[in-house]
Amino acid sequence: MNGSGSTAKESLFNPTPRKLGLPEDNTMTPYNGVRSIFDNSSGSRQLTDEHTNQERAISKAKLADENIAPFLAKHIPSQYAPLGADASKTTGPPRPMNSRYCYRHRPDLKCRRQADEPSMDHLQWELQSLSQSDQQGIAHVWSLFSAAPAKQRELMLRGILAQCCFPQLSLISSSVRDLIRIDFITALPPEISFKILSYLDTASLCRAAQVSRAWKCLADDDVVWHRMCEQHIHRKCTKCGWGLPLLERKRLRASKEQIEKRALGVSVAPDSSTIAVQTVDATSGVKRTAEDLEGSDSQVVKRQRLPTEDTELHRTNVRPWKDVYKDRFKVGTNWKYGRCSVKVFKGHTNGVMCLQFEDNILATGSYDMTIKIWDMETGEELRTLTGHTSGIRCLQFDDTKLISGSIDRTLKVWNWRTGECISTYTGHLGGIIGLHFENSVLASGSIDNTVKIWNFEDKSTFLLRGHSDWVNAVRVDSASRTVLSASDDCTVKLWDLDSKQCIRTFQGHVGQVQQVIPLPKEFEFEEDHDAGHEEDSNASVSGDESPLRQEPCSPGASFFEGDRPAPPRYILTSALDSTIRLWETYSGRCLRTFFGHLEGVWALSADTLRIVSGAEDRMVKIWDPRTGKCERTFTGHSGPVTCVGLGDSCFVTGSEDCEVRIHSFKN
């Protein structure tokens, strides 16, 4: 048994006594072995052989320990140093982290993978069923493998696998299948885990939160759900096609910088100079506090792993973004399936011609010459503004003032909180049937076919002439210093306030245009090429034949030179030809026509997710602005629907039947 004729594989897995550190024993020959088995002549001889075998096993174990101990002490001195460690080798600077090891086997870290208790119990039971010598041999093999460096481990494993039969390979395959499943979310730094989780959809995130407490902490974090809110709220997600109703934009803006810093692994230290911005969620009324980082030198500090008292207090006052998303998702689902509650406000004695609402305040104007202020939650009429001598056709209000326009040719400015009329403006030769203000610029449209611009800062005014019939609606865009106007002459015009000239005319309607509204900048149109070509050809027949219309142009290129902002890219118009049209202002093209109303469309309101229209046919329709599909139709008014208002979780309609209806999708 000197092993000279054995292969390398045999010498690896069938070591001779010399390879284990044992001297060759001439008594261990085949002859002696056979003689010890078949010679039963003396019982004392058998006892002597048993005693010799025990001594030999003990001697083998001692010699194996003497050979294995230096190997273990060399590779894992911190865990196994029975011979004593050299103090001179332990002094000095700490060794740098070795990146060649995986996170399970780094020498400077303990294994963070928990042992499988049932498997270890079964392994221990099987080991104890073996003889003492077999237990020692197996323990030595485990110790050698545990202490071996990575390359030697791989060599050992390849050799073991080469000796395995198919049943053993099957056992290895079934065992490895579970062992290689790594909890990467917990093992990775939080910043990388946030990045991974941010690619999941809502259903997958909710499932991830059920895996473990560590996963729940990461999957429910504001970093992940703030990004989810940005993807879906007030816009259609390009991945899933879902869009959720708008909530206060301040909340997204104020929290965005803090959330982004947390996602990168840093946090913003609270500063006494920061301004706290509090907003109220439209669905539940729970306040969410966010720090406004503008104008403050916020100190960026290293991220704290343990929450402090300040952060805990902040968390108790801040509503999690997951809850915000959940509420918005419920509202969005109600919008999709038409689940809503209806409130009817009665108080006007003539047709309701205009309305606007903000938060829970609703203002309505009527042909009965009054403006009424309502509490939308309770339905209570807060006050009535009187002073006009004819029907009120248009109004708009903000936090401090309300401006109304009437057939009596006047504009009135009100303190709507007290009911006081602050001032009255005259200048039109006919009744005022449309108005809109933004910042310090007010535009009004009149029966006298003109648009008048009022500047509150320098008190200047001027007229825009070009329409040949009543101007029914106007919209100011103060950023680009432009105004849109819709008229009974079947056209829509875009005006430059600096040059006081019309820079584009949109033609295509065959009935009087009643409304024009710009779509938010966040709106992105997905053009259907077949439908788009059809709309282009139809619009070009009756549209403006100027070169500006036919040439494709980049945003703002055909309007202004330099860095001046361009006007809104997309606008919506409605007319008494029973249609709604979507236009691109840069090219002048009509991108889509919405068909469905049976009679003229009087009222129009829209955001990035939907369009609401009211018509002479007494119906209110909800449209998808991207596809042109009518998603739902609401009835209930007994007269033409003359005005509509759209919010994140409700829409309001007014009619010539003197009623105001609120459709709420909150519950």
Curated annotation (Swiss-Prot):
Cross-referenced PANTHER family: UBIQUITIN LIGASE SPECIFICITY FACTOR/HREP PROTEIN, UBIQUITIN-BINDING SDF UBIQUITIN LIGASE COMPLEX SUBUNIT
CDD domains, per the entry: F-box_SpPof1-like, WD40
Annotated function: Component of the SCF(sconB) E3 ubiquitin ligase complex involved in the regulation of sulfur metabolite repression, probably by mediating the inactivation or degradation of the metR transcription factor.
GO biological process: protein ubiquitination
Official protein name in the record: Probable E3 ubiquitin ligase complex SCF subunit sconB
Disordered: region residues: 1-55, 528-562
Keywords: Repeat, Transcription, Transcription regulation, Ubl conjugation pathway, WD repeat
Native source organism of the sequence: Talaromyces stipitatus (strain ATCC 10500 / CBS 375.48 / QM 6759 / NRRL 1006) (Penicillium stipitatum)
Subunit record text: Component of the SCF(sconB) E3 ubiquitin ligase complex.
